[in-house]
Design a protein with these regions (language model features):
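Charge-rich, low-complexity N-terminal segments
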Residues: 1-56
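Detector for Asparagine
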Residues: 4, 19-21, 31, 52, ...
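Short amphipathic beta-strand/extended segments with alternating polar/hydrophobic composition
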Residues: 44-49, 69-80, 122-141, 145-146
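Context-gated lysine
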Residues: 8, 15, 28-30, 54, ...
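Generic intrinsically disordered, low-complexity segments enriched for polar/acidic and small residues
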Residues: 6, 40-42, 74, 100, ...
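Surface-exposed beta-strand edges and flanking loops
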Residues: 20, 26-28, 37-38, 49-51, ...
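Acidic, proline/glycine-rich low-complexity IDRs
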Residues: 132-166
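An exposed acidic His-Trp-rich patch
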Residues: 60, 65-123
């Protein structure tokens, strides 16, 4: 698997859409954007946007050499979660206070890759980090969420979003 430093390196790489004309259609329950980094072409990335009762944005990496997939970052709205209780030496200090924490479905949170654990096993409340979209209260909030998530994963392409018609 990856080290914490490798995961950070991958998140920090500048990424662009493989298909720059792709549109996120919010009337669909799931959208997938395929990304690539011209800084390191050994990897492909994708972003999955799930909008149903639970709203989830996830970015994963595809290592072309080993043909393996690893989740790097995910944001959950309206989904519960339980962080591991065990603290390994690879756990960053900022996550230690959240060991064994149960997230209620009403507590939005960001999952992070941590070396030595299953991918995305650790999460931190959005209220405790500098991510601007803390809650989703109306469909119009989704566009801002997608743009801020793109910024978080260093996606440089413009994203075309088609709003759902209610």
């Amino acid at each position: 698997m990856l080290t914490n430093q490798e995961a950070k390196y991958l998140l920090d790489l500048e990424k662009v859409l493989i298909n720059p004309n792709q549109t996120v259609d919010l009337s669909k329950k799931k959208n997938r954007l395929e990304l690539i980094s011209h800084q390191d072409s050994d990897y492909e990335f994708w972003v999955e946007i799930t909008t149903n009762q639970k709203i989830i944005l996830k970015t994963s990496i595809h290592n072309l050499e080993s043909n393996s997939y690893v989740g790097l970052l995910r944001i959950d709205y309206r989904g519960g979660h339980h962080n591991p209780a065990n603290i390994l030496p690879t756990l960053p200090n900022f996550l230690k206070p959240y060991a064994d924490k149960w997230f209620k479905p009403t507590e939005s949170h960001m999952h992070l890759y941590v070396e030595g654990y299953k991918p995305l096993a650790w999460a931190i409340p959005l209220t405790d980090i500098n991510f601007p979209v803390k809650e989703i209260t109306q469909p119009a909030d989704l566009s801002g969420l997608i743009f801020n998530f793109a910024r978080e994963i260093n996606l440089k392409s413009l994203i075309n979003i088609q709003q759902a018609i209610l």
